[in-house]
Amino acid sequence: MAKVCMVTGKRPISGNNVSHANNKTRRRFYPNLHKHRFWVESENRFVKLKLSAKGFRIIDKKGINIVLTEIRARGKFKESSL
């Protein structure tokens, strides 16, 4: 899963570079992704996730345990994904 947020599902989108002369060339807009280790107290281990900045805020709001159960229910998290 390259360049996809594991929490929000954000992925690259396409658009245009626009020059001062209004010339347009195609480009990709990438999400603001970071790899991060979270300590999961219930499993007594670290879990590595690839997250966007919005994914971090969702984990701050809901908690890592709830977010992990949602990711596993969607089938997007493998134990050796990173």
Curated annotation (Swiss-Prot):
GO cellular component: cytosolic large ribosomal subunit
Keyword Ubl conjugation: no
BP terms from Gene Ontology: translation
GO MF entry, a single one: structural constituent of ribosome
Pfam families per the UniProt record, alphabetical: Ribosomal_L28
Keyword Ribosomal protein attached: yes
SUPFAM superfamilies from the UniProt entry: L28p-like
InterPro entries reported for this sequence: Ribosomal_bL28, Ribosomal_bL28/bL31-like_sf, Ribosomal_bL28_bact-type, Ribosomal_bL28_sf
Keywords recorded for this protein, A-Z: Ribonucleoprotein, Ribosomal protein
HAMAP family listed in its UniProt record: Ribosomal_bL28 (MF_00373)
Family affiliation: Belongs to the bacterial ribosomal protein bL28 family.
Name this protein carries in UniProt: Large ribosomal subunit protein bL28
UniProt source species: Vesicomyosocius okutanii subsp. Calyptogena okutanii (strain HA)
